[in-house]
Design a protein with these regions (language model features):
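A general alpha-helix detector
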Residues: 11, 24, 40, 44, ...
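Long, amphipathic alpha-helical coupling/dimerization segments that relay conformational signals between
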Residues: 29, 103-132, 146, 151
């Protein structure tokens, strides 16, 4: 398929190529059912605007693509993962060929989802924001998304959010801000999730 060029897609490909990010995405996708395209969108919007989207726009973004994610992207993803390593007595060369076709279909479906997000919620670039400000905005956007998507993943009063979630989101955010210290990013993510309880 041919798609129009868009900075959001280019941003996502760049971040996804960084060390640890593919594994972090898989961890939150499998462990928490999160939409990776939304995670990338919330980070991209923070980088572009230099401020949080706010809970209303975070929710609007999720509502824009929930049906597509649940009925198109996730079923393709599940089928692709189910075929990894073969499927029962089906010929492995055939199941592998089908799996490769599903990889391409999944990538196209994700690309379509990202273009839809960018169209439905336009963001405007604010160049004056520094990386610290953009980091705070990205972490706030992600925390708002988690609050509406998986409230039980938040920290109980006086407790800590799930460590695997903190680690995966910190790795993703570090891929967005490779110039910032990873320990600081992890602390910011943990604190933002804790505040939402």
């Amino acid at each position: 398929m041919d798609f129009p060029v868009h900075s959001f897609w280019d941003f996502s490909l760049s971040v996804h190529s960084r060390t640890g990010v593919p594994e972090a995405c898989l961890a939150v996708q499998r462990g928490y059912g999160l939409d990776i395209n939304l995670l990338f969108f919330y980070c991209w919007a923070a980088v572009q605007e230099g401020r949080p989207l706010g809970r209303e726009r975070v929710t609007q973004a999720a509502n824009t693509v929930t049906g597509w994610q649940e009925e198109v992207v996730r079923p393709i993803w599940k089928a692709r993962w189910r075929l990894k390593g073969g499927f029962g007595s089906f010929p492995p060369e055939q199941t592998e060929a089908l799996r490769k076709t599903l990889i391409a279909a999944e990538l196209d479906a994700e690309h379509m989802e990202q273009l839809r997000l960018a169209e439905a919620l336009p963001v405007s670039a604010r160049r004056e924001a520094d990386d610290s400000t953009r980091l705070a905005a990205a972490v706030a956007n992600l925390a708002d998304y988690l609050h509406t998507s998986i409230p039980d993943a938040e920290a109980p009063p006086g407790g800590a959010p799930p460590e695997d979630l903190i680690q995966a989101l910190s790795t993703l955010v570090a891929g967005v801000f490779p110039g910032l210290e990873s320990g600081r990013i992890r602390d910011d993510v943990a604190q933002a999730l804790k505040k939402r309880s």
